């Protein structure tokens, strides 16, 4: 056992940094979520008559064990934070090569399944968000069937928090969560074994060795960083409740009604999607617009070209004068992203637009005009244009 510990402790891979581990942090958090969620399942009481009582007491220990619920709740926050950082980092690096097409698509599909898992979980938590989340999920399901019949009844029954609904969503939440962990594992394998899309499998032994070393190094960095974070928060906060919603609630609507703050957990999970629904005049337009967003994100490698040869014909503007090509001729060498002025400017505006769109509060119909404003609409227009056309 000591030899195994020393092996992991001393193993280093020079090209793996902490900033490259957002995806790995996400997967590790999912594993913790499976453990805490399983413990919650052991103590779950699907009795709707208890919901008003626990809401009045502002505690849910009558439905679940409180510590595991707190751990599970904070884990969702971490998964969203890590997954958004991971996605934005990959968009910055333009990881759209032939070898990474499978890993990109499996990652986007995992991100979509994660939204479904959280939807089910928000209903099961039995807070003030449960009813509205249940209604939104049922309406989304109803929209795909063009409002014909009641196909949503199989999962959401009559859109009420009754015993039948809680049991069905509990099963759906557990099955989809374990399926998400399986997709995350496949995504990690796809991203490290980049020979997946190649017609031949040469160099398999060396790539497996690289995978083992990289994974060991990621585990080491993860646990070291986790220890420092634990010590920091142990010294800063005496009670674990201090890390609850307060860390996401900087600002008070009662003091400033027009404030645009980003951290109202758990509203901020779906704030970009909620803001999009505000901008759309019809509900079905907004739902299919969200579907179009995930389709665009899913086919990023196809939109930008998955062949290595495509990178030689791009018209780019960089800081370095030696890279500027005359008469748009192809450059025979690769261009660094850090020196690509065109990429830096377009990505900067992309981040600014991404920050502006979720600044609309989830109950934005009361604080912002329906349909948004010009800046809001332009931000969404730029986001879609960046994902579709910008290399």
From Swiss-Prot:
A ubiquinone binds at residue 192. It is found in: Mitochondrion inner membrane. Gene3D superfamilies: Cytochrome Bc1 Complex, Chain C (1.20.810.10). It comes from the Eukaryota. Heme b b562 binds at residues 72, 173. One of its GO terms (molecular function) is oxidoreductase activity. Its main location: mitochondrion. GO terms for biological process: respiratory electron transport chain. Coiled coil: none annotated. Keywords: Electron transport, Heme, Iron, Membrane, Metal-binding, Mitochondrion, Mitochondrion inner membrane, Respiratory chain, Transmembrane, Transmembrane helix, Transport, Ubiquinone. Pfam families: Cytochrome_B. One of its GO terms (cellular component) is mitochondrial inner membrane. The main subunits of complex b-c1 are: cytochrome b, cytochrome c1 and the Rieske protein. Component of the ubiquinol-cytochrome c reductase complex (complex III or cytochrome b-c1 complex) that is part of the mitochondrial respiratory chain. The b-c1 complex mediates electron transfer from ubiquinol to cytochrome c. Contributes to the generation of a proton gradient across the mitochondrial membrane that is then used for ATP synthesis. This is Cytochrome b. The lineage of its organism: Eukaryota, Sar, Alveolata, Ciliophora, Intramacronucleata.
